[in-house]
Amino acid sequence: MSDRYDLIIVGGGPAGLAAAQAASAAGKRILIMEKDGWGGTCTHRGCIPTKALLACSRSYSGLKKLRRVGIGTGEATIDYAAMRRHQQQIVKIAALGARKLLADAGVEIAEGTGEIISPREIICTNPAGESRTVTADHLLIAWGSEAVVPRGISLSERIMTSDGIGAIDDLPASIIIVGASFIGVEYAVFFAQLGVKVILVELLERILPQEDEEAAQFLRQELVRLGVDVRTGAALAGLAETPAGVVMEV
């Protein structure tokens, strides 16, 4: 098979998937490569895993509310390992679905990394370390971004980005979430509904700064109702690990 394509896409997340399907529908020969998981951040570390976890916490919270209207359900318990298995299964199904969409569209799929060596050439290396050079008339870079870690903050098992928080093995007794955009707010709701003490810190004067102000205000009230300690207009000055936990300075 020829190693020349009309379009090579580096990154199999939402942007790469949409571009590959559209270009293939236009009759172009497409190669898309992905090193970390089909569907990208949304599928593996963002929208889909958070929604899977929120479905669990919402169900637990709903069971507790039934008692208020006279419906007894026994003592509700939390099996966090089972919640994680549910999350992983949902993510697996979504990733397989993303890959199938590409295959059904006639897009050539490559798992591995891509190294750009010229405006039209890429070295594609698969997980086994085997490489080949591919060329294209056009190149789309859609490899996404990484979470920003404030200067002076070192990541560890207890200090992590949003990429890592969804993969922790045990439910914490308390958690500090720095950043009140949609991912931070989703995790604040999830942990609060499971009874975790949550502190949500935002540098700007309101949560969800990119969303409608009235909606953000309503959601803040809901967070407070859940017991979340919401602190806006608060700059993170430092984090330190101690034997007792993580200490935050704002």
Describe the role of every protein-language-model region.
Residues 16, 95, 184, 213-216:
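Generic non-transmembrane alpha-helix signal with a bias for helix starts/N-cap capping motifs
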Residues 2-5, 21-28, 33-171, 204-208, ...:
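Glycine-rich flavin
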Residues 27, 195-197, 227:
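Glycine-centered short loops/turns at secondary-structure junctions
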Residues 13, 113-115, 181, 234-235:
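Conserved acidic residues
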Residues 12, 91, 180, 212:
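Charged, low-complexity surface patches
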Residues 220-232:
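ALDH superfamily catalytic-core signature
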Residues 158, 169-211:
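Rossmann-like NAD(P)H-binding beta-loop-alpha module
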